[in-house]
Amino acid sequence: MGKVYDWFEERLEIQAIADDISSKYVPPHVNIFYCLGGITFTSFVIQVASGFAMTFYYRPTVTEAFASVQYIMTEVNFGWLIRSVHRWSASMMVLMMILHIFRVYLTGGFKKPRELTWVTGVILSVLTVSFGVTGYSLPWDQVGYWAVKIVTGVPDAIPVIGSTVVELLRGSVSVGQSTLTRFYSLHTFVLPLLTAVFMLMHFLMIRKQGISGPL
């Protein structure tokens, strides 16, 4: 085993990477509230894992979506647990994100030179809310259907381009299969990809600039 490690160490300098990660200075004023961002990230990882598991059984059609969710809850082994964990971690992610934003704002973590870290954080908060909006519709029950109808109808109040935006969101004039397909694609591919990219940027900037000092 040692020879295998030495082979990789010679080529990748694993120990140097490990030392860099583990030797980062942590300011003495840091407390448990500075862990809120990490908890948000952990919730996102749980979301990805549990959501991926459900894609094996969920069917994104207006005729089968609700039945497939019922199948996950009643027939799939531990399906009820996976979906429940997905729902609980979603709530946890939103709550921890809100608390994280308050912590950063109250401790001045958005000030120079960390403005871009704050901007990426705001973008991540918008993406998180978008997860909630798109995911809420996927069971395609009465609550999900009317939530989508209301949310996608809001831009209709925008002058000139309102109706175009509504049609773009819904995929047609009315809410239907095209809407569900769009929301499913956003929820399972577009939003996770964008979130992963902005999280990486967020973490790299924190890594580069360090944790902000006390007020």
Swiss-Prot record:
This is Cytochrome b6. Heme b 2 binds at residues 86, 187. The chain crosses the membrane at residues 32-52, 90-110, 116-136, 186-206. HAMAP family: Cytb6_f_cytb6. The gene is petB. The 4 large subunits of the cytochrome b6-f complex are cytochrome b6, subunit IV (17 kDa polypeptide, PetD), cytochrome f and the Rieske protein, while the 4 small subunits are PetG, PetL, PetM and PetN. The complex functions as a dimer. It is found in: Plastid, Chloroplast thylakoid membrane. GO terms for molecular function: electron transporter, transferring electrons within cytochrome b6/f complex of photosystem II activity; metal ion binding; oxidoreductase activity. Heme b 1 binds at residues 100, 202. It comes from the Eukaryota. NCBIfam families: PRK03735.1 (NF002990). Heme c binds at residue 35.
